[in-house]
Amino acid sequence: MSSGASANGLRYDCVVIGGGHNGLVCAAYLARGGRSVLVLEAAEEVGGAAVTREFAPGFRVSACAHLLHSMSGAMIEDLRLGDHGLAFVDQEMLTVALSADGEPLVLGATGRAVGGPGAGGAAGAGSAGGASAHMGYLHLLNRLAAALRPMLDGVPPRLGTNAWGDRRALLQLAWQIRRLGRHDMRELLRIGGMNVYDLLHDNFDSPLLRGALGFDAVLGTNLGPRSPGSVFTLLYRLAGAVAAPGKVECGRLGRPLLQPRGGLGAVSRALASAAVAAGAKIRTGTAVECIVVRAHRAAGVQLTSGEIISADTVISNVDPKATFLRLLGAEYLDAGFTRRVSNLRTRGLAAKLHLALDRLPLFTGLTEDLLGNRLLIAPSLDYVERAFNHSKYGEFSAAPAIEITLPTVNDAALAPAGRHVLSAVVQYAPYNLKNGWEGQRREFADIVVDTMERYAPGLRKSVIATQLLAPPDLEREFRITGGHWHHAELAFDQFFMMRPVPGAAQYQTPVDGLYLCGAGCHPGGGVMGIAGRNAARQVLGQAA
């Protein structure tokens, strides 16, 4: 917003605003490309929302996301994160769909049933034919997701240009879809805009399987299973699982779901170490007041202390609304662009609950060797849809859908000896809760614990301490507008070449010298690092 002159002579080729994981990835690649880079992080530690924090004496937990789902092994290897301290637990991370009164269903990351009702025997129906149909359609969904994988990795093309890079990206995407063959291509076109409720009811018999896949389709979004476009978000998640495997030196190979030792903060620390080793500098506890603009070009930043740091290029890891409307200012943008940014849907709908436990909880029908996996409370599609219905009216459900991990099962160092941590992502927790969060925070936390108690009798008696992070808390603590972990809703109209808005969908912005690299860019949230890498490539002038 400032147009003042440089104050103290500090100058870099690139300044990255925000030391979240995407900002750190961006800084590492820029430094490797020969640029002088400074990362400015307002918090006292790097990582943004990908940090490990102590929430009770001796108990540490990943503050937001608690598993790596879509970070590619190729990127982990390319940045040599293993050499910078990143390691993963040995546990083969599976998804376990819990049942309150029966046997749970165990799934692989791409939806393949590997145990429980629907595994081997029959998609919940007790027939070999049912199992065959179940596996056949899952294979189809994964083929469709694999065809969409290049969309996740690449820079979205611009429409209406003759630039070879844009034309090549469109041709590559068209070729990937064409390679599916007539049947699969027709199916992709048929189901792409459907709701996941109808798709799963048409093709699977097991309520647990339907519920688990439906939950994955809407996790972290403002959608329910019956919402149009929720098949697309399921394919998006499956595409991340397809894209994730690769040879890595710091853990097991080819696993889409990974639990880092030390929590997600270990990923951020390794990224910071890699960036510094490449030549980047990082300053924590340093908040940016505004982006300096001179001659209609980003020329640096002004800190809240008044210090001005000049740069040829400014890359913002901050969410798009905060970048354009607060740090830059609408006076440097045309009215149409400003309106599109203002209308971005950015209100979060997921909460995070942390429990410090005096013992390991036992879940109904679950053997102890399965407790180190990802556990889901989403017993049916109707259950998830009913939870979503309340959120539309600014309310929370008495029966929320929940993703649970017990990170201390695989990483005992996160809690005192013999104690455990439970980390839960809860759908749905409206940002604009009717009558506000302050008076209802305890009630919501109690509902979540009571819901888990139905699947893990005795859980409540083992709770030593509780921490709830509702969307307004995420907004305040991690400076994310609306507390949305994707920085902006992930939906058809806010994806790919429309993300965050036309005119800024290729990481470049309407202001020369200003780029975006955060989760509000393509391909969205989750600890992937793709947006940071692609933004760096754009700055360096390399083809993604």
Model-predicted segments: where are they?
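Extreme N-terminal leader/targeting segments of oxidoreductases
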Residues: 1-14, 32-33, 495-497, 501-502, ...
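N-terminal glycine-rich phosphate/pyrophosphate-binding loop and immediately adjacent elements
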Residues: 7-162, 487
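Mid-domain catalytic core of redox enzymes
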Residues: 10, 259-261, 287-415
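A conserved FAD-binding loop/helix module that cradles the flavin
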Residues: 65, 519-540
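Conserved FAD/dinucleotide-binding core of flavoprotein oxidoreductases
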Residues: 113-122, 265, 321-326, 356-358, ...
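Flavin-binding catalytic cores
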Residues: 128, 360-361, 393-397, 437-476
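A glycine-rich dinucleotide-binding beta-alpha-beta segment and adjacent secondary-structure elements
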Residues: 206, 211-227, 378, 396-405, ...
